[in-house]
Curated annotation (Swiss-Prot):
PANTHER family: QUEUINE TRNA-RIBOSYLTRANSFERASE. It comes from Francisella philomiragia subsp. philomiragia (strain ATCC 25017 / CCUG 19701 / FSC 153 / O#319-036). Zn(2+) binds at C303, C305, C308, H334. The lineage of its organism: Bacteria, Pseudomonadati, Pseudomonadota, Gammaproteobacteria, Thiotrichales. Substrate binds at D92, S93, G94, G95, F96, D146, Q188, G215. This is Queuine tRNA-ribosyltransferase. It catalyses: 7-aminomethyl-7-carbaguanine + guanosine(34) in tRNA = 7-aminomethyl-7-carbaguanosine(34) in tRNA + guanine. It is an enzyme of class 2 (transferase). One of its GO terms (molecular function) is metal ion binding. Belongs to the queuine tRNA-ribosyltransferase family. One of its GO terms (biological process) is tRNA-guanine transglycosylation.
Length: 368
């Protein structure tokens, strides 16, 4: 029996305003989860993440298992004790990272064998091992082990991949056993709507605490992503959280909320920040462009983050050009605050019954 509780507070069309409750704290949805692959969101402290409004962060099973390893983390207690984040943590199962290894992996019914990207040693990962690692980490939300269907894939390739993921989903559920943490199933099936239907049906029969859409934002055209979202999101169980994995841009988030999604994660705001690619209320600003060299204006006058309250575009441009670590930090603080504020504004619009109006205005005004 999971300790997670989900409350659907309000709906507008397909868009949902909700709350996911855990002993470690509540997650107001729609929610964006900053990505802390190795247990830390790059350059930021837990205090800073809380100040910007994050209710939950994402850690990566694959990377934490390889380094530092669960034995070291268990000496502290859980991942929360190790990294100082006392709110909920979701851990990805490692399936996507194995997928990204490409030809360096060997896939069988039992699991995946691959060379460690750290020291080249032979490593084996299976649904059972992934569930044990996530139990050891003390994850609040555990993701079942799956194979992320590559793009492009023929219908047969997508079907074979999806069916393997469904068998692994059942093994994940069995191995999860009496773990009170929430376990989410992952819908696969590539760009084929009927395969997505088959996958969702299988996952409903296994019965999970939440449902995720996987295998999107892997190189497919935007219209295909929207088509699969349109087809799939509203069919997911109404009484459980819906999570879109690895997506995406501010526009993607607004459009996915419109289609009924509750949870998101993406490396984009933090990774792009380190490359001087800033998200603002008016669209994307590329701070390393020469035109910002003598621009004394604030990055985003509509933003309340530390960066926007204290530093000019000119200074941020200077930090980027000189590759100062502070530049990465200030940029990351801004981008993640922007994403958290976007979700807060979406939640408020849903509470006030004006999300459709908010969406229309956002899509008209946001450039990039």
């Amino acid at each position: 029996m999971t300790v997670m509780k989900f409350d659907l507070i309000k709906k507008e069309g397909k868009a949902r305003r909700g709350k996911i409750s855990f002993p470690r704290g509540d997650i107001q949805t729609p929610a964006f989860m900053p990505v802390g692959t190795y247990g830390a969101v790059k350059s930021l402290s837990p205090v800073e993440l809380k100040e910007m409004g994050a209710d939950i962060i994402l850690g990566n099973t694959f990377h934490l298992w390889l380094r530092p390893g669960t034995e070291i983390i268990k000496k502290h207690g859980t991942l929360h004790d190790f990294n100082g984040w006392d709110k909920p943590i979701l851990t990805d199962s490692g399936g996507f990272q194995v997928f990204s290894l490409g030809k360096m992996r060997k896939l069988t019914e039992e699991g995946v064998t691959f060379k460690s990207p750290i020291n080249g040693s032979k490593v084996f990962l299976s649904p059972e091992i992934s569930m044990q690692v996530q139990r050891d980490l003390g994850s609040d939300i555990v993701m079942c082990f799956d194979e992320c269907t590559p793009y492009p894939a023929t219908e047969k390739e997508a079907k074979d991949s999806m069916e393997l993921s469904m068998r692994w989903a059942k093994r994940s559920k069995d191995a999860h056993g009496d773990n009170p943490s929430a376990l989410f199933g992952i819908i696969q099936g590539g760009m084929y709507e009927h395969l997505r239907d088959e996958s969702l049906k299988a996952l409903k029969e296994i019965d999970f605490d939440g449902f995720a859409i996987g295998g999107l934002s892997v190189g497919e055209p935007k219209e295909d992503m929207i088509r699969i979202l349109d087809h799939t999101a509203h069919q997911m169980p109404e009484d459980k959280p819906r999570y879109l994995m690895g997506v995406g841009t501010p526009k993607d988030l607004v459009e996915a909320v419109y289609r009924g999604v509750d949870m998101f994660d993406c490396v984009m705001p933090s990774r792009n920040a380190r490359n001087g690619h800033m998200f603002t209320s008016e669209g994307v600003v590329r701070i390393r462009n020469a035109k910002h060299k003598d621009d004394v204006s604030l990055l985003d006058p509509n933003c309340d983050c530390y960066t926007c309250q204290n530093f000019s575009r000119s200074y941020l441009h200077h930090l980027d050009k000189t590759q100062e670590i502070l530049g990465s930090r200030l940029n990351t603080i801004h981008n993640l605050t922007y994403y958290q504020n976007l979700m807060k504004n979406i939640r408020q619009a849903l509470e006030e019954g004006r999300f459709e109006e908010f969406r229309k205005e956002f899509l008209e005004n946001y450039k990039g």
